[in-house]
């Protein structure tokens, strides 16, 4: 799920995907789901860690609103530390502004 620059509100395209996937997420039992917040390289490391956390928290709050049990969901922020795309342009940055779902 991707985010606009310097934003943590969930975009309408991401809301649509989460709404469609909510039933599958509700059925997910056993194990833990980790929502990893990520940012592009712009901004200070401290700012990006906080922004990544706000992104992960926003996704968890939206999942809760959809009726997904959040007791086994954790959030973590990696800020700019784990880019998906190593480039240094808007195309790469857009891919790096994301929340990644990881199941353990």
Annotate each predicted stretch with a short phrase:
Residues 26-28, 92-95:
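Extracellular/periplasmic catalytic domains that process cell-envelope and extracellular macromolecules
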Residues 29-38, 53-84, 97-104:
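A non-catalytic structural micro-motif
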Residues 13-20, 46, 50, 54-58, ...:
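Extracytoplasmic/secreted proteins, especially bacterial periplasmic and envelope-associated proteins
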Residues 86-89:
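Short beta-alpha junctions and helix-cap segments that line functional grooves
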Residues 1-19, 40-45:
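Short, solvent-exposed beta-strand/turn patches at coil↔beta or beta↔helix junctions
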């Amino acid at each position: 799920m991707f985010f606009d620059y310097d934003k943590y509100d969930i975009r309408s395209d991401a809301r649509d995907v989460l709404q469609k996937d909510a039933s599958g997420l509700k059925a997910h039992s056993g194990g833990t789901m980790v929502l990893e917040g990520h940012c592009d390289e712009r901004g200070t490391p401290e700012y990006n860690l906080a922004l990544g956390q706000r992104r992960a928290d926003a996704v968890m709050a939206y999942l809760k609103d959809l009726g997904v049990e959040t007791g086994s969901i954790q959030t973590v922020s990696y800020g700019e530390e784990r880019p998906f795309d190593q480039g240094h342009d808007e195309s790469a940055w857009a891919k790096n502004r994301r929340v990644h779902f990881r199941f353990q």
